[in-house]
UniProtKB/Swiss-Prot annotation:
Keywords: Amino-acid biosynthesis, Cytoplasm, Histidine biosynthesis, Lyase. This is Imidazole glycerol phosphate synthase subunit HisF. It comes from Thermotoga maritima (strain ATCC 43589 / DSM 3109 / JCM 10099 / NBRC 100826 / MSB8). The lineage of its organism: Bacteria, Thermotogati, Thermotogota, Thermotogae, Thermotogales. CDD domains: HisF. It catalyses: 5-[(5-phospho-1-deoxy-D-ribulos-1-ylimino)methylamino]-1-(5-phospho-beta-D-ribosyl)imidazole-4-carboxamide + L-glutamine = D-erythro-1-(imidazol-4-yl)glycerol 3-phosphate + 5-amino-1-(5-phospho-beta-D-ribosyl)imidazole-4-carboxamide + L-glutamate + H(+). Changing C9A: No change in activity. Heterodimer of HisH and HisF. The active site is at D11, D130. The gene is hisF. Belongs to the HisA/HisF family. PANTHER family: IMIDAZOLE GLYCEROL PHOSPHATE SYNTHASE HISHF (PTHR21235:SF2), IMIDAZOLE GLYCEROL PHOSPHATE SYNTHASE SUBUNIT HISF/H IGP SYNTHASE SUBUNIT HISF/H (PTHR21235).
């Protein structure tokens, strides 16, 4: 059985990590390379860099950053945010990103999923889906959760797999930032619809929440602030999960 993965998410703006971190032993906690290296050393299985820089002219900064990260880090890393076309996705992968995460662009141009998958393999394409409840149905939202697409979550999950996605990054807008636990109802809803790995996102606040996500059917759990502010220690989290019967990677811890 494949080990369940713990993923840290870093928001990057103009080549710097924002939203703050609380690591005293880092010279510069705003440096994505240093922070990424640190995370890889303490047992995080994968990293997601989310480029929240709005402007296209800053893309060069992200490309240079990806190159530096690829040189320094030996765990898989995904880059997302602002990827609207094949050229951008392609450049990021060629510079060293293991995977790219696409969200709004995938909804607006689903053939982009297929194009990236056919060129670089399905494992390089993560489709990020932001969903929330509307009148009792899970609906897909784009533009950072602002626009209701009118697409049912169940339909979109099936389509992204057909189109060649390798993974689904499932964020519950209702839970994001609440620290009240992952949306296990949403995870359970999506699980039977796809054979793709599901990364649960939104709501991590304590170790039990990770266990709940895995028991609900998630293959990986992503979190940000609980790691950045050391509210959860990665080693302790993995030991806790193992004790509760979850297969996690402990080598190097």
């Amino acid at each position: 059985m494949l080990a369940k993965r713990i993923i840290a998410c870093l928001d990057v703006k103009d080549g710097r990590v924002v939203k703050g971190t609380n690591f005293e032993n880092l010279r510069d906690s705003g440096d994505p390379v240093e922070l990424g290296k640190f995370y890889s050393e303490i047992g995080i299985d994968e990293l997601v860099f989310l480029d929240i820089t709005a402007s296209v002219e800053k893309r060069k900064t992200m490309l240079e950053l990806v190159e530096k990260v690829a040189e320094q880090i030996d765990i898989p890393f995904t880059v997302g945010g602002g990827i609207h076309d094949f050229e951008t996705a392609s450049e990021l992968i060629l510079r060293g990103a293991d995977k790219v995460s696409i969200n709004t662009a995938a909804v607006e141009n689903p053939s982009l999923i297929t194009q990236i998958a056919q060129t670089f393999g399905s494992q390089a394409v993560v489709v990020a889906i932001d969903a929330k409840r509307v009148d009792g149905e899970f609906m897909v939202f784009t533009y950072s959760g602002k626009k209701n697409t009118g697409i049912l979550l169940r339909d979109w999950v099936v389509e992204v797999e057909k189109r060649g996605a390798g993974e689904i990054l499932l964020t519950s807008i209702d839970r994001d930032g609440t620290k009240s636990g992952y949306d296990t109802e949403m995870i359970r809803f999506v699980r039977p619809l796809t054979t793709l790995p599901i990364i649960a996102s939104g709501g991590a606040g304590k170790m039990e929440h990770f266990l709940e996500a895995f028991l609900a059917g998630a293959d990986a759990a992503l979190a940000a602030s609980v790691f950045h502010f050391r509210e959860i220690d990665v080693r302790e989290l993995k030991e806790y999960l193992k004790k509760h019967g979850v297969n996690v990677r402990l080598e190097g811890l």
